Structures are given as structure tokens and as C-alpha cells.
Amino acid sequence: ISLVFFVLLTTNAKGQTADSIISNMDDIEVSLLTCGPGNEVYSLFGHTAIRVCQPSRGMDIVVNYGMFSFKQKYFIPRFVLGLTDYQMGITTFDDFKAEYEYEQRWVFEQTLNLTSKEKSALLQAIDRNYKPENVTYRYNFFYNNCTTKARDLIAANIDGKIKYNSATSEYPSFRELCHSKTSSHRWSQFGNDLLLGIQADLPTNISEQQFLPENLEHDFSLATIETNTDEANNTTIGANNASPRKLVSHEEYIIPKY
């Protein structure tokens, strides 16, 4: 199955082809969705996903790197110890929103300020990642989770690089960051500490702190895109010939905090 096939199955995108979906980027919006924490051990840190919306063609989907199955043997212990396989999944935005409304968890949307070329590259990357041979990955709380996967996918398909402008003099350890979210879940704390080992009390940099969804949300709000420059020809690479530009063009709660 591919992204295009999923869109054709779940929307009113009649008459569309793969080429038409990938090539018509002008009115497509790509957003980062940050979700509040839940009550289960696997949702204590919150969640991150990517929304791709094109109302004119009836497309509104969510790309989600947080899919898993409870059928995995010893799921909770494996999750706590970072030994769980996760999958990338795609769902409709309406279904995604309904789930978080039911669980009474807030969702914050940040619309990304991307060029048509960047949006096209991102959708093609999503399509590749959605192939059966690429869809599964080994989840890790700190270095390979739903938030870092979304961040890295976006960063890899930007015509330049993301500059994080978050000014901070605080560099908490992984242990401190985790315990701020797991104070009432001792087994989760134990598993996190065991997984980190000697790294647990080392100070973290901005990139490492972004394993927490709310930290990435904050950093995206202040981030800019530094456009690539061809120094030999003294030309700017990118459709808008503008550098820097804000990474986020608009942000709002689509489900408010309860």
C-alpha cells in the first residue's frame, strides 16, 4: 500500500493519480501535531504526528509514527526497556481527532512554512516510508520515538536546515526530563533509568531534549529555515530565494487543554 492509494481509498479524491497528488502542492498544508499526555504508560510523554491537508481535493490525513500492537509478547516490559517495534501508520484526520477528544487530550497544530518543492519532497518521503519494508522501526524513548521521527522527516526534506533559536541556560539530564513526566509511574521511571544507564545524569542539548513532544513544539515555534546557498555561483537554492524564514507560519489548539 502507498500514501497515494490510502488517500484514494479514504477521501473524495476522485480521478486523482499519484502524479496529480504529488505535483499539486500549492494549496497543501503540512502541520506538526503535538498531543498532550495520557494516562497509560505508553502515552505519558505525549505524542507527535504530521498532518497533510488539501481541502480542495478532499485530503486530510495524519502520518503517525506511534502505531503498535498490544499483541506483542510482554508489550509493557518491552516498551519500558526500549525493546518495542513501532510502525508508521496513516489515518484520516477526523479519526485521529476523535480519538484524542475521547481521551480528553489536547492537540496543538503548527502549520509549517514550506515551499511547494519541500512539500513535494516530504510527501514522497512519506510514501517511501509507508512501504511494507520500511514501515516498522525499533522504538526508543529518547533517540527514535514518534517525535524524533517526525522532526527528522521534516528536517531531511527542507531545502536548507532548521535553526533552533530557543535560548536556554538549562540543560537538564535525561533522568530529570523523564521524571517530570513519570512521577506517578515508578516502573516507567525504573525502565527509563535502566535504558539510559550511565547517560541518565548527563546534561542534554536542545536536540536531545526534543524527544519530548512539548519541547519540540516549543522549539519549532521559534525556529527558522536557513536556505542553502551555492557559494560558487552566489545563488540561493530554494523556490522563494529567501533566507531565513520562519519554520511555522501559524499555530493554534485544535483540541484545547482540558
What residue ranges belong to the model's regions?
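Bacterial Sec-dependent N-terminal signal peptides
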Residues: 1-19
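Soluble extramembrane regions of membrane proteins in the secretory/endomembrane system
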Residues: 16-258
